[in-house]
């Protein structure tokens, strides 16, 4: 389920967003999907589902190709403006500044990375409102049970989060929606959010785009540095929605990127020391890519 703060006109007979949500769990289970004839889905999206399934199945055969039975329709309803998913982090802030002229809405989600309690959620909303005010954008807040929904099927968030971002874009009927890249062209890996996948979730009226692959962490912060108010409002922490803790791996990685951009003052709750950087534990290929990028950038800067 989804709960929005804005009054968007939603067609109760359009099941496109629910098909997006159900696709990857159904592939994991090997269960076909049948959409009741009283509902319809986007013809463009239905056509692309075969390709989405091919990509997921090629990456991991545990995701079986399934049959979809649904009435399709060429959507022609009026779409809203351009939106971008935003949690206050480096990737979303870079996209906001890079595409400032196009973006009209910033979309903040509770139940995606975290299930925030009321106080934490209100803190996140207040922080994001500072950014929307500074950049003259509108805020869309979304609450969802995505985290529990995905966990119920034993799915990792990485597998299904492209589907849920797509479903929100489709449900809001945004004309264009940006999903921010977490890596670069040379560091791509199999993930539910990927440039080979994201555009395939588009409908006739909603174009979904994967953006930001041209910039690594340091490049992104170098752009954000030019907007001191946006920089001061960054939130990167894995551990606490209310602060940047200064202890988790994301905070420490951000600290290194800030140093590489000659930024020494940043509001971490606990000051980060160079010894903390040396003690980073590499838990996977994504962590290793960040460390390699930092080493390369530091070496270039002597």
Question: For the regions a protein language model found, what residue spans apply to each?
Answer:
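Beta-strand-enriched, solvent-exposed domains that form extended recognition/catalytic surfaces
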Residues: 1-7
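Extended acidic/polar, glycine-enriched regions
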Residues: 8, 14-23
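Nucleotide-activated chemistry modules centered on ATP-dependent adenylation/adenylyltransferase
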Residues: 21, 26-33, 39-85, 90-302
């Amino acid at each position: 389920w989804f709960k929005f703060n804005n009054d968007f006109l939603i067609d109760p007979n359009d099941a496109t967003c629910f098909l997006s949500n159900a696709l990857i769990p159904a592939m994991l289970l090997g269960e076909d999907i049948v959409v009741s004839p009283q509902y319809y889905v986007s013809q463009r999206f239905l056509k692309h589902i075969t390709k989405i399934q091919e990509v997921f199945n090629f990456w991991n055969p545990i995701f079986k190709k399934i049959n979809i039975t649904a009435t399709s329709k060429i959507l022609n309803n009026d779409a809203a403006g351009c939106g971008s998913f935003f949690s206050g982090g480096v990737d979303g802030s870079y996209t906001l500044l890079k595409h400032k002229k196009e973006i009209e809405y910033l979309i903040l989600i509770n139940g995606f990375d975290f299930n925030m309690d009321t106080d934490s959620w209100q803190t996140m909303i207040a922080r994001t409102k500072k950014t929307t005010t500074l950049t003259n954008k509108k805020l869309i807040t979304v609450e969802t049970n995505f985290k529990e929904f995905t966990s119920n099927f034993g799915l990792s968030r990485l597998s299904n989060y492209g589907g849920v971002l797509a479903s929100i874009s489709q449900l809001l009927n945004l004309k264009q929606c940006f999903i921010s890249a977490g890596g670069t062209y040379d560091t791509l890996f199999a993930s539910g959010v990927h440039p080979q996948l994201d555009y395939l979730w588009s409908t006739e009226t909603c174009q979904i785009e994967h953006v930001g692959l041209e910039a690594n962490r340091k490049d992104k912060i170098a752009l954000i540095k030019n907007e001191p108010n946006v920089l001061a409002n960054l939130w990167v922490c894995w551990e606490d929605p209310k602060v940047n803790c200064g202890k988790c791996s994301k905070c420490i990685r951000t600290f290194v990127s800030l140093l590489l951009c000659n930024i020494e003052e940043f509001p971490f709750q606990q000051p980060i020391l160079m010894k903390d950087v040396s003690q980073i534990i590499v838990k996977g290929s994504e962590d290793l890519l960040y460390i390699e990028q930092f080493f390369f950038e530091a070496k270039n800067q002597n």
